[in-house]
Amino acid sequence: HGSDHIIEKPKFGYGKPYNDYGIGFYCTQNPNMAKEWGVGIDHNGYANRYKIECDGLTILDLNAPGYTMLHWLTILLENREFDTSAPLAAEAKEYLMNTFHLDYKSADIIIGYRADDSYFSFASDFINGAISYRQLCNAMRLGKLGQQFVLKSKAAFEQLEFLGYETADSKEWYKKKAFRDQTARRQYFDVERNRRQRGDLYITTILDEEMKPNDPRLR
């Protein structure tokens, strides 16, 4: 877990409600990513290391075959603040939340993409009709941001054991964080955003055809 301080015992119920998956303890299996998340432009950070026993815990893996990128996006729409002032975006949000909603709050742990600033903008472009579903899926892999591992329940917190920490120097790791974000944005505009393909699936088609989660075009 990347932070600006050492966290030996995370507090259940503490955090920002408008994070990707709501209140929870956000972790990664990649220590370098944790260092990037922990630093700021003017302060060092820490990669807090833990281990967790997952037996008996309910894990919602949004990358499992039974889910689509729209399931992930719907959870994001429920928690993050999107600009849905445009009619298409408002209609898209309503349809996705009615059709692709998951009971994610009952899970002990959620595994899925992390929506850093650039990735959040990709999702916003999709619900506004600027990019296709294929482009959204490709864009989420740009910059190799990876997955986040989010503890949601008290039971999950009780299974967490602190192992130690590594210090992250701001001068080194903030530069890497900024470069990753810039790379993702550059690749997005160079490779994805303006490269429409015939047959691409846009949010307008998903709405018009009232597509459901089991539609093979979403796999």
Segments from the language model and where they lie:
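ADP-ribose/NAD+-binding catalytic cleft of ART/PARP-like enzymes
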Residues: 1-20, 40
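Short His-Asn-centered micro-motif
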Residues: 1-3, 27-29, 50
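Short, flexible loop/turn elements at secondary-structure junctions
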Residues: 4, 31, 54-56
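Surface-exposed loop/turn and secondary-structure junction residues enriched for glycine/proline
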Residues: 9-10, 15, 24, 55, ...
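Solvent-exposed, flexible loop/coil residues
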Residues: 11, 16, 25, 29, ...
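Extended catalytic/binding region for NAD+/ADP-ribose chemistry, centered on the ART fold
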Residues: 16-41
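Structural beta-strand/beta-sheet cores of well-ordered domains, especially the beta-sheet scaffolds
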Residues: 23, 46-48
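Conserved NAD+-utilizing ADP-ribose enzyme module
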Residues: 41-45, 54-219
